């Protein structure tokens, strides 16, 4: 398949899954002016009615097969729950559609590796929602590192704790917190280090006696000697009257530090 897109031509896309994340993508695509949102698919009737109301130019469907069979559709956005992602990615490859996928790319590690193998052996372009690499604050911090302002990079510490979804609140197919949200930080730490992971140790807490850990702390090293420390969980005071967050990045070098705090409204470097 020809993967070249003209800047003057809108990219024709079908959105599959129009829940919270699907609507975020729809909004971003509308704002960019680069996309023709030809289809919106969702199995929920109420959600389909909402799609018809706010995106009247799109054909709203219940079954995604029509999107895959439309040869004019170049890209599919896969924003349903993780248990359906493998099947949809298989169909996208079979029908020659480029892929924008929400994370995680499947609901188990075995299926995720199957997705990786399929994509690597296909001729479609694919991307996963690991957006932190595009954020202004991470790019600014990396610029400080590249300019040598903190000396040689030595230690990367990331903490992200929120009163997010507790077990049973709609997060089951995405897996425990570290398997879903935590992958942002696994990815961004590697991006900073510019190296592959060498060693790691982790511990988790099965909050509320749930079967999976909802809080994980992982630390280790990269092949180039940089040390990392990631703390992530959805356990930060769900029942509090006034909810808060604890989100920060500390990057420590031989001659200085650069750090960022984020309260989900404002990031400060």
Question: How should these model regions be labeled?
Answer:
Residues 39, 75, 155:
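Short, Asp-centered acidic motifs that coordinate Mg2+ and/or phosphate
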Residues 1-55:
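N-terminal Rossmann-like dinucleotide-binding module
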Residues 83, 106-167:
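A contiguous active-site-proximal alpha/beta segment in oxidoreductase catalytic domains
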Residues 25, 55-118:
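Beta-loop-alpha module in the N-terminal Rossmann-like domain of NAD(P)-dependent dehydrogenases
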Residues 101, 126-128, 157, 230, ...:
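Hydrophobic residues in well-ordered beta-strands that form the structural core
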Residues 62, 101, 128, 201-204, ...:
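Short loop/edge segments at beta-strand edges and connector loops
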Residues 129-137, 160, 164-201, 209-215, ...:
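Mid-domain beta-loop-alpha active-site segment that forms a flexible
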Residues 1, 186-266:
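Contiguous beta-strand/loop segments that form the cofactor/metal-binding neighborhood of enzyme cores
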């Amino acid at each position: 398949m020809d993967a070249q897109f003209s800047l003057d031509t809108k990219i024709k896309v079908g959105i599959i899954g129009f829940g919270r994340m699907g609507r975020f993508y729809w909004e971003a695509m509308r704002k960019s002016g680069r996309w023709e949102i030809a289809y919106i698919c969702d199995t929920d009737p109420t959600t389909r009615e909402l799609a018809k109301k706010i995106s009247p130019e799109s054909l709203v469907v219940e079954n995604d097969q029509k999107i895959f069979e439309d040869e004019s559709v170049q890209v599919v956005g896969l924003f349903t729950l993780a248990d359906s992602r493998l099947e949809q990615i298989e169909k996208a490859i079979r029908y020659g559609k480029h892929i924008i996928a929400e994370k995680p790319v499947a609901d188990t590690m075995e299926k995720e590796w199957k997705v990786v193998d399929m994509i690597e052996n296909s001729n479609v372009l694919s991307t996963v929602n690991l957006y932190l690499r595009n954020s202004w604050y991470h790019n600014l911090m990396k610029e400080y590192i590249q300019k040598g302002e903190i000396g040689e990079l030595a230690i990367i510490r990331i903490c992200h704790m929120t009163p997010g979804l507790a077990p049973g609140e709609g997060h089951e197919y995405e897996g425990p917190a570290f398997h879903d949200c935590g992958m942002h930080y696994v990815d961004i730490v590697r991006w900073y280090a510019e190296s592959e992971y060498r060693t790691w140790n982790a511990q988790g807490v099965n909050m509320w006696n749930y079967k999976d850990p909802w809080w994980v702390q992982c630390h280790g090293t990269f092949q180039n000697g940089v040390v990392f420390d990631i703390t992530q969980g959805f356990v930060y005071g769900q029942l509090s009257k006034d909810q808060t967050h604890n989100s920060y990045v500390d990057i420590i070098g031989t001659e200085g530090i650069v750090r960022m705090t984020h309260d989900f409204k404002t990031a400060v470097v």
